[in-house]
Amino acid sequence: MSDVARRIYQYGTWLMLVVIIGQFTAAGAGVFSTMADDASGAYILRYHTIAGPLAVLILSLVMIIAAFIGRLPWRMTALAAAFIPLLFLQSLFIIPYRYPTDIPTLGGMPWLSALHVVNALFIFWLAFQWPVWTRRDLRELSQRRAGPNELEAKPAQAAMHV
């Protein structure tokens, strides 16, 4: 079961990257379509604001569960969990732009919404690095569990097949 959970975690990191790229694409398409008075831009932005964050949240929760079941190191569990507060910050940073009259103090600071893009870039960087870090961590984990005797035997076996 833990091997299956590790595979789910490993493939989930790539899926998260695809979802985040989809979020960037939807945001750009939605903004530029809306600026061009294309009504389809509103639907694309609706995906960006509802379906995309929901997919990131659900995938993060699945990854946290997979990390626990797979008995992965805490660092790997924390990486999966890191997307949740970053997602929460995304929602907070857009408030001054989307709802300027609801919270007058924040409405006077529309520049604060620029942090929405900065945070999105950090989320993208994290999602981009995550599969690489996961591959490295899983390789180190399997080497530690294999023990020194098995690691010494593998090069000898490889030399015999040459």
Predicted regions and their residues:
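Polytopic transmembrane helical bundles with strong interfacial aromatic enrichment
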Residues: 1-162
